[in-house]
Amino acid sequence: MLLDKYAEEIETSKYLDVCKQGVNVGLLSEAGVPAIADPGASIVKIAHENNIRVIPLVGPSSIIMAMMSSGMNGQNFAFNGYLPIDKSKRQKEIKKLEKKSYDYNQSQLFIETPYRNDQLLQDLLKILDRNTEVCVACDISLPTEYIKTFTVQQWKKIKLDLHKRPAIFIIHKDPLSV
C-alpha cells in the first residue's frame, strides 16, 4: 500500500485493519527512516491510539549519521525537518535556527527536497554569520558520499553541486568561539 502526505486519516486507519486481525506488518520509507519527516508518523500515531504494538527496528539513519560525522555538538541537537519553501519564510527560519543554536549551544539539523538543496545552501551562506559552522552531509553511505563541516566564510570558497542529491544540513553557532 502507498501512503503519502495527502492521505486522509480515515484512509490511513485502513492500513492498520490487518494489524487488528493479529497480522504483523512493517512500515518502510522510500527514503530515510519511517515516521521521521515522513507521512508514516500518522500510521504510528493511529497504531498507538488503537493499542497496536509498535516495534522500531534498528537501521541506519542519515540524520544520526550526519550528526555523528559533523564534529558539531552531539550532546544537544535538534532535528527541524523541512524548512519553509517560501524564500522569505525560509530565510527567517534560518536566522531563527542560528539564534537558537547560539542561545542554547544546540546543533540544528534540517533537510530539503533534493532539487532545492543548492538554493538552500546559497541561502545559508547568504544569511548566516561568517563564523557559523555548516555541515553538508549528502549521499550518506553511497560511493559519492560527501560530508564536510566548514564555517560560512570557508564554504563561500567552495563550489558544490547538491542538485538532486539527498542531503542533511547542520548549523552550529558556538557561543564559546564568538
Model-derived segments and spans:
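Short, well-ordered secondary-structure micro-motifs
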Residues: 13, 38, 66-69, 89-91, ...
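A contiguous loop/helix-start segment that scaffolds small-molecule binding in enzyme catalytic cores
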Residues: 20-24, 103-178
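Class I S-adenosyl-L-methionine
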Residues: 1-53
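Gly/Ser/Thr-rich loops at beta-strand to alpha-helix junctions
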Residues: 32-35, 62, 115-116
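A short acidic, often aromatic-flanked loop/helix-cap motif at beta-alpha or helix-coil junctions
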Residues: 6-11, 85-88, 141-145, 176-177
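Short, hinge-like loop/turn segments at secondary-structure boundaries
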Residues: 17-19, 45-46, 70-75, 127, ...
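Class I SAM-dependent methyltransferase SAM-binding "motif I" and its flanking Rossmann-like core
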Residues: 42-100
